[in-house]
């Protein structure tokens, strides 16, 4: 079972907005996003620490998934979407005109709400991104498959059926396969958009344990509507409401002694 008291020794609890560049994975400055005339995000300012799990929480429609999708520019695919401000990934401005979007998305992997394996074998799902990069050597691909599936805690369950269709896996196994597919290309950041909302409690626990393990190698940002889950898996938590960042800090502090009444009301179920 994973520990609920992660090592946060390099930060004091409320220093999250004063991180050094060295400890910062993602720096968001004055980020505003509009869909047409509708404001979805307003003046978001935050630094996300590397090698930690950061959770975005908030009521439905608050902007948390929109913010998550800004980190790998998925919102570029939305018509009439306008973005102002900046996001830096390890110092690189991802909204700079010269940014290569495919390269960015190799650096920032993403897993969505419902498992979405490709209609291919388990093996081909994992190597899909590697093949796109031009990697063809069988030995390299085989090693990458084993490493990614082990990292996703799936190897022992599928090692004898790698060439079977991925649709034959359970929902929880499919989601772990999707995570393996994302990490096979070795991203720096892994974005998880409500990754357990379509899963049963046992599969949810398995994914939560996996998230805790993944932070040893990746910076993880998760959107979840489940506050108990955010409290269990995150080192830092951001409460977002009506497109604004209300409060952001150490997860234990957010869930036990939040500064803002709005945060307290949401966490205690008085609204939202």
UniProtKB/Swiss-Prot annotation:
GO terms for biological process: phosphate ion transmembrane transport. Its EC number is 7.3.2.1. GO terms for molecular function: ATP binding; ATP hydrolysis activity; ATPase-coupled phosphate ion transmembrane transporter activity. Pfam families: ABC_tran. InterPro entries: AAA+_ATPase, ABC_transporter-like_ATP-bd, ABC_transporter-like_CS, P-loop_NTPase, PstB-like. ATP binds at residues 58-65. SUPFAM superfamilies: P-loop containing nucleoside triphosphate hydrolases. Keywords: ATP-binding, Cell inner membrane, Cell membrane, Membrane, Nucleotide-binding, Phosphate transport, Translocase, Transport. It is a peripheral membrane protein. Residues 26-267 form the ABC transporter domain. The keyword Cell membrane applies. It catalyses: phosphate(out) + ATP + H2O = ADP + 2 phosphate(in) + H(+). The keyword Lipoprotein does not apply. It is found in: Cell inner membrane. Belongs to the ABC transporter superfamily. Phosphate importer (TC 3.A.1.7) family. Part of the ABC transporter complex PstSACB involved in phosphate import. Responsible for energy coupling to the transport system. The complex is composed of two ATP-binding proteins (PstB), two transmembrane proteins (PstC and PstA) and a solute-binding protein (PstS). This is Phosphate import ATP-binding protein PstB 2. It comes from Aliivibrio fischeri (strain ATCC 700601 / ES114). The gene is pstB2.
């Amino acid at each position: 079972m994973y520990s609920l008291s992660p090592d946060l020794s390099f930060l004091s609890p409320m220093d999250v907005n004063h991180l050094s560049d060295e400890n910062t994975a993602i720096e968001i400055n004055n980020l505003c996003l509009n869909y047409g005339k509708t404001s979805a995000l307003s003046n978001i300012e935050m630094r996300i620490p590397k090698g930690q799990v950061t959770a975005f929480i908030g009521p439905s429609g608050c902007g948390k998934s929109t913010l998550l999708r800004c980190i790998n520019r998925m919102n570029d695919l939305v018509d009439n979407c306008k973005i102002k401000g900046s996001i830096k990934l390890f110092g690189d401005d991802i909204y700079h005109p010269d940014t290569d979007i495919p390269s960015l998305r190799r650096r920032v992997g993403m897993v969505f709400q419902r498992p979405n394996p490709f209609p291919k074998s388990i093996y081909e799902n994992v190597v899909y991104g590697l093949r796109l990069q031009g990697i063809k050597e069988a030995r390299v691909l085989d090693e990458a498959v084993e490493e990614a599936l082990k990292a996703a805690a799936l190897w022992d369950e599928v090692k004898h059926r790698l060439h079977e269709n991925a649709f034959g896996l359970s929902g929880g196994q499919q989601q772990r396969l999707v995570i393996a597919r994302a990490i096979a290309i070795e991203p720096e950041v892994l974005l998880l958009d409500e990754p357990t909302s379509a899963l049963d409690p046992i599969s949810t626990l398995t994914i939560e344990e996996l998230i805790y393990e993944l932070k040893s190698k990746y910076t993880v940002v998760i959107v979840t509507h489940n506050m108990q889950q955010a409290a269990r898996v995150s080192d830092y938590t951001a409460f977002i409401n009506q497109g604004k960042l209300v409060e952001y800090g150490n997860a234990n502090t957010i869930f036990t002694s939040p500064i803002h009444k709005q945060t307290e009301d949401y966490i205690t179920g008085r609204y939202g």
